[in-house]
């Protein structure tokens, strides 16, 4: 459950370390984003010589949330923190590696590149 002003960890090697959500995309009054939703973020902390730098405004897809995701069988998958993967203008990941697990729900949102790069799909 991500909303405006939420700080997220970055789960790829794009060069960003922490980002802040500045808008939830998908409707003029949409308040919350969950796993698989695209948000607009600004880079708050970045590493030197990375692909993105502090202050950049990018799209990102949410891959892990503390709120978790509810499955059809009644189970819930929760994570210890909120994390996102940076996207370019074509909705493709900027980084070439994904860190940490991601959920199967990204498959239904057609983020197959993220699924294939992830070390573990829950």
UniProtKB/Swiss-Prot annotation:
GO terms for cellular component: cytosolic large ribosomal subunit. InterPro entries: Ribosomal_uL14 (IPR000218), Ribosomal_uL14_bac-type (IPR005745), Ribosomal_uL14_sf (IPR036853). One of its GO terms (molecular function) is large ribosomal subunit rRNA binding. The keyword RNA-binding applies. The keyword Nucleotide-binding does not apply. Keywords: Ribonucleoprotein, Ribosomal protein, RNA-binding, rRNA-binding. PANTHER family: 50S/60S RIBOSOMAL PROTEIN L14/L23, LARGE RIBOSOMAL SUBUNIT PROTEIN UL14M. Belongs to the universal ribosomal protein uL14 family. Part of the 50S ribosomal subunit. Forms a cluster with proteins L3 and L19. In the 70S ribosome, L14 and L19 interact and together make contacts with the 16S rRNA in bridges B5 and B8. Binds to 23S rRNA. Forms part of two intersubunit bridges in the 70S ribosome. This is Large ribosomal subunit protein uL14.
